[in-house]
Amino acid sequence: MMTSHKPSRRAAILLMLAGAAILSLSGMDRPLCGPQELSRADDLYRQGRFDEAARLYAQIAAQDPASYGAALGMGRIQLLRNSLSEAETWLKKARELNPQEREPQALLGEVLYRRGDYAAAAPFFESLGQKAKAEKLKAFQDRTPFLIESGPDVSALPFVVTDPLPQIKVTINGQEGTFLIDTGAWELHVMPAFAEKSGLKPLATTDKGIYAGGRTASNAHSLADSVRLGDFALRNVPVVLPQSPGGPFQVDGIVGTVVLYQFLFTLDYPKGRLILRRNTPEMSKSVRAESEAAGAAVIPFWLAGDHFVYAWGTANGAGPYLFFVDTGLAGGGFICTERVLKEAKIELPKEGIQGMGGGGAVTSYPFTVDLTLGKVRRDKVRGMYGAIPPGFDERQGFRSGGIISHGFFRAFAVTFDFQAMALYLK
C-alpha cells in the first residue's frame, strides 16, 4: 500500500509555528523603526530625556542606517555628553546623509571648537554666516589656544570679593585687572579701557551678544598673547571685547566658562576662592573620590553650545526642569520661564524693579522660591522673573525651566568636572 506524502493538518501547524519561532529568534519579525519612533525620540529629546532619546535613536540607526534624524539625534546627544569623538562620528554621518542641512555643520564646528582645533572650526562657522567668530578662530592658524605654559597641578585664587558676585585678579599681557567669574559668559570678556591698557587689538569684524532681558550689545574680538590665572600662565587666549562698558559692576572684565573649562575648577564660596586644577582623567578621578568621601552631592550635567551647563532641578516641588547653571546673577539665585512661573505657582508683585544686564536696563519682578538641584535643596531663594531673553526656554532645542545662580550656590563649594560631566556640591 502506498503512503501519502501530504502532511497532516497538525503537522502543517507545527511546521508553521517552528518557522515563526526561528524568525522571532533571528529578530526578523521585528518591524523596522519608522517615522513614529523617530518622532518619539525627537519628543524625548525636546523634553530633555536625553538618555532615553539616545537609546531610541541608536535602535533606529541600527535598523535604518540611512536615517538622517537618528544620526543627527545621536550627534546632538553625544555633544551634550561632551563625548566629542562620538559626536563627530554621528554628525559626519548626518552631514553625508543630508548635505544641505545646516545643523550638522554647526554642531561639527562646535565639536572642533571645544576640542581646541580653532583653525579647523573656522570654515564651519564662516559657512553659517558667523563671520566674527570665524575670523577670530582663523587667527589661531599657528597657535594652540589656552596653552598652559607653566603652572602646578592645582592653584587657588582668592576672591577679591564674594558678593554680589565673586571677583578675582587676572593678568593680561602683563596688566593686572579685576574680573568677575560668571559661568553664564563664554570666553574671556575684557572691557574697553582695560583692553586698551593691555594692548588688545580688535579684529575687523564685530557681532552681537544676547544678554538679560533679550537685550543685545555689539562685541569685537581679539587674542591675548598671555593670561595669568593664579599660578597658571596661559598663552593664546581668545577674547571678547564688549563695545560698551555695560553692567552694574566696575570691573575690568569677566571670566567665562570657556576659560574655566580648560580646568577642573571649584567655586569655593564659603572659603572665598577659585580653585583651578589641571583637567586630566587622573585629576577627575581623584576629585570625584575626594568629593564623594566628603559627602558632596554629585549632580550630572549636560553641556550645550559653548558654555551652557544644564542640570535637573525643581521649583516649589514642580518639575523636574533643566536649569541653566549661570552663576552670574547678582542679588538672586533663580530666573524662571513663564511655564515654571505657572506650574510652580509663583506669585509676583505688581511692580517690577529696574536692573542692569550686559545689554542695558532690564525690568524684573522679584519673588522667593524653594529650589532643588539634584538632591540639594535650598528654601526661600530669591528669584526674578522677566530677565530671560525671549525664546530662551527652547533655545537649545530642548525645554529649560530657567537659570539657577549665585544665591542658590552661595553656601557651597561647587566643583565643575567636564571629564565626568558632574557637579560636586559640598
Report residues per predicted region.
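N-terminal export leaders
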Residues: 9-14
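C-terminal segment of classical bacterial N-terminal signal peptides
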Residues: 22-29
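Pepsin/retropepsin-fold aspartyl endopeptidases
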Residues: 29-426
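Intrinsically disordered, low-complexity sequence elements enriched in Ser/Thr/Gly/Pro
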Residues: 7-8, 28
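Hydrophobic helical h-region of N-terminal Sec-dependent signal peptides
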Residues: 16-21
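N-terminal secretory signal peptides that target proteins for export/translocation
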Residues: 1-7
